[in-house]
């Protein structure tokens, strides 16, 4: 087809090109130009992606001069590595002003592979034609698979679509979901220091409220196989209760169960330090514990098994992606207390933790997202230094008239224990793949961010018996990563322990 003379589209006007079109005059565009009929609802989908397998014939629009007045040219492109697209040809003249290019990815479902060479030529300057530096720009993000595609002007005056060296923001965002879920599970399980433990023969129920900040430093980013940089907060409520306390062959045995509900929200950064998005996780957990304590020596061992249901939502500027899954955790911890003085105790501790995670696969606006089974292991070595009060309530001296003798205690008379717990935590053997791609062969990209690393952890706490059967505990802590991609942050917790 052909266009005779000067063609001018005012704002709000549109023109549909059927086949190759040559304009014998200039084109001035403030409206919309469409290659083929892309205005039908079945042809254009959100986020510049068309699904389907119908063969596509690409076309050219040729003109001597194009003056952009904020108008848009809607073009089709196949992001399957074939470098095929509609083209705008500037023949011997100039492209000036400002023209927006809107691309629709056509062909097989959500094609998306890395471009090769100079990229996909979409504006072809021929016979000495020139194009101003700002003559063209993308009107909307173009994404497929793991890639962002950008519009670039080369020294030959042509304009090309290229996949960025850096992956699209959703790559580190989705990869961080594995890390965030497992970080939360480990925090919830904690160590023995996260319980207010009162010695005695009676069963007890404990209610804990915990919150804190958690993050990962930039250690090279997703492109170098590291956990993406992130920073966020969490909060949880945990209720646990003893089911059985008994003596067996010189050992004190305690078993119980716990349940917890929590939420975490983490901001994730791209490899270049820009914001990738936010991941939110609502989690519900059930667990059980077994404690064995050697009566004469005090040597103890804690065994914990925990399962957590995660409901996660990752939000970026271009996508809202949801995934659900299950996290599993097993922990074995042991310690042996030594009395330094009558009221001071030193207790070396060692803890091993294994974690697993499985998240559901899904799809966002640019392709599929698949998660491999995640797992990681931790070893914590440290010691606990603190007072060694037997927490006997005794008789108080308060002169206040009270209903119960057990409340006749001044604050300074309450039985109190304090403790500090420095540790080194080594995370190793971390696994967990996240794959993104489309139906196109060669589009699949797999990312395996490592969570291996070492951190230093310091916890401190205080517990006071305020009634014969009630103990209150508070604690705070800080973890600092010294190598690799281990987590760091701070936490605080308050615990109410009631025996019966």
Task: For the regions a language model picked out, list residue spans one by one.
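Extracellular beta-solenoid/beta-roll
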Residues: 1-100, 104, 109-163
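Primarily extracellular Gram-negative trimeric autotransporter adhesin
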Residues: 3, 20-22, 26, 159-179, ...
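Alpha-helical protein-protein interaction scaffolds
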Residues: 61-63, 366-370
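Short glycine/serine/proline-enriched coil/turn segments at secondary-structure junctions
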Residues: 80-84, 110-113, 249, 340-342, ...
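Short beta-strand-to-coil "C-cap" segments at the C-terminal boundary of structured domains/repeats
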Residues: 105, 124-126, 162-166, 242, ...
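Short secondary-structure subsegments characteristic of cysteine-rich extracellular domains
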Residues: 112-130, 223-243, 369-376
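Outer membrane beta-barrel translocator domains of Type V secretion systems
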Residues: 164-349, 354-356, 360-362, 450, ...
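Outer membrane beta-barrel transmembrane domains
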Residues: 371-500
